[in-house]
Structures are given as C-alpha cells and as structure tokens.
Amino acid sequence: MPYERKIINDPVFGFINIPKGLLYDIVRHPLLQRLTRIKQVGLSSVVYPGAQHTRFQHSLGAFHLMSEAITQLASKGNFIFDSEAEAVQAAILLHDIGHGPFSHVLEDTIVKGVSHEEISLMLMERMNKEMNGQLSLAIQIFKDEYPKRFLHQLVSGQLDMDRLDYLRRDSFYTGVTEGNIGSARIIKMLDVADDRLVIESKGIYSIENFLTARRLMYWQVYLHKTSVAYEKMLISTLLRAKELAS
C-alpha cells in the first residue's frame, strides 16, 4: 500500500509531510483549525507589520522539527516505537491548542489563573474522548508521565521543538534576523543520555547562538515597549468590560 500523506508548503521549512491517519485527523480537527485565526505573536504586528503568522503555522513547523528530531535520535540507536513517534508528534501538534487571541493577554483577564497549558490539556482530553483514546499516549507524554522522559523534553523543555520553531518563524516574519537560528544543526546534534535530551559537544556553539538569539528576540520583539503598551491597554479594556458586565 503506498504511503499516503498530506503535503503542506511552509515558507520557513519548505514541504511538510503529514501522514494520513491520526496526525492528519488532528490537523483537520476544528480545535486545531481554530489556531489559523490566532496570531502567533499577538499584538507584535503593531511594530512589525509582517508578523501576521498564526499559531497553526507554528504548530505545523514544530511538528516538522519533531519529525526530524525523532529520525535523528533513532539514527543514533535510541529506540523509539512507531506508536511513541506518532504520540510525540501529536503532542507537539496540540501543545498550543489552548491559546486564545492576543497571545497571553486573556490569561491575565478573561481566564485569569488558568494557563494556556491547562486549557490545552483539557481540550486534548476532550479530543481523546472523540477519538476513542487514540491520544492517550500523547497526553501521557505532554503531562510528563511517560517513562521515556526525553520525549516530554522534546515537547516542553529548554531545547524543545516549540522554541526551535518559534524563534525561526518569528524571526522570519518580523524581519528581525538576529533571531534566526540553525535549527537543522541543533537537531543533528541531539542525543539521549540517562533518559535525558543532550547535545553533542561539537554542538555547543550552536546552543550558544540559540540562547543569544532567544534573548535578542525577547528584547526586540516579545518585550518591545510599543507592543507591551498595546497589551496593557487591551488588558485594562477587557478588565473594565468584565467589571461592567458583572
């Protein structure tokens, strides 16, 4: 039987292959499709007009990097079952499913005290019921309850696929070139030791560049004074509306 897949052309990574089956069903699901209408960097477009990319695009990019990372780790003798590979790919596709509009603004107003990670988990569990338990392993990995801890680190850690994608993607769309990182080289340097994600010694320079790029992106994009001011005004507006409605 021929390998069936959906091919998506991504401006950052080129062609992204999504296998037909569970992963493609996740991509088509209304809860993930909702992210096509949510900007990845919230109100940063008031400063960087090109920053119109969405959390859906980011989720696909992180999925692509996860696929590359799994292949690389397996090539170094780290045994990963097909079911585990599919589950960790599902987990990264769904990691931002709980995000609302305007980045983290809603966490400080409408859904105060509830993080987007908690909402993501709640929605994942709802989807798992719809899909007759097919996401159970992905949820275990997402919650860091699976024995192979390095799989969770690929989803949420200091050097996860989430960060590798958003730094390259946000750099690309904002035009802040200082944020561009060599994600391909970093992934090639990944390995596992004592059930933890590690980097080969010859990849240290790439990690230093990654840390520097992340810091520069926070200074120039995520914490830019103008977009932060816009967020503060929006928070004040939403809190006032909430007060009047109560």
Where are these regions (language model features)?
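Sequence-structural signature of the catalytic-core scaffold of metal-dependent phosphohydrolases
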Residues: 1-39, 46-90, 98-246
